[in-house]
Amino acid sequence: MVGFGLGTLRYVPEESKDKVTSDEDVLGTLLKVFQALFLNDFNKQSEILTMLPESVKSKYQDLLAVEHQGVKLLENRHQQQSTFKPEEILYKTLGFSVAQATSSLISAGKGVFVTKGLVPKGAVVSMYPGTVYQKYEPIFFQSIGNPFIFRCLDGVLIDGNDKGISKVVYRSCNGRDRLGPLKMSDSTWLTSEIHNPLAVGQYVNNCSNDRAANVCYQEFDVPAVFPIELKQYLPNIAYSYDKHSPLRCVVLVALRDINQGEELFSNYYTIVS
């Protein structure tokens, strides 16, 4: 493997090529969550809505009407919308919520926990955010002392560090790809106010002898048909602009039912080179 200085890499082992959940199910979950987030933020989406086809606008208005059937006044609807936090939307949509907290492992720092509900086996429980690098792209300086670099099977790297030069690079790419009010990715995972509640996968700790893995990493390429108005919730962006290649994402999938209060543990290898 090419040296990465003092950096460490997480990666999907070769024997994990078989996907726990189909790409269709992963896509379905992301669309379901992102659409719910979009509807929850509907009164903030006016600029984006003006750029969408009438058929798409009508679809969201119909969905919103169904969601708020019992609400007669527009003001009340907006007031009701503003009461839901992203993690509450996640719970309403998938039946569980996850969040960062101090890990149950000594000296492990942050971890990710199921804060409410039950995660069923096979469910997408979080996403691994960050800048996506092709294997030929420069990442040496970003990798120094960086424990948040994830290596995919094909050598694609995802830098999930929310600090330092990694943060600067992500913000720069995020601004580069923006089309007026249309954001091609979500940068709020770099802040304390996360809009996509799934974007906490970089803080999932490795399993240990007494803490078996309950989630696994799974690669997912965003299809070309992904709704442009929902890309604002994707917590990944390509280092180099390339409209022809699909965006690589990595999701974490439950290996078993995971109960409220449990910490998520993955199975990754750390390589120091």
Curated annotation (Swiss-Prot):
Domain SET span(s) in chain numbering: 96-269
UniProt protein name: SET domain-containing protein 9
Listed EC numbers: 2.1.1.-
Organism expressing this protein natively: Pongo abelii (Sumatran orangutan)
Origin superkingdom: Eukaryota
InterPro entries: SET_dom, SET_dom_sf, SETD9
Residues involved in S-adenosyl-L-methionine binding: Y268
GO aspect biological process, one term: methylation
Record's keyword terms, sorted: Methyltransferase, S-adenosyl-L-methionine, Transferase
Main EC class the enzyme belongs to: transferase
GO MF assignments: methyltransferase activity
Similarity comment: family membership: Belongs to the class V-like SAM-binding methyltransferase superfamily.
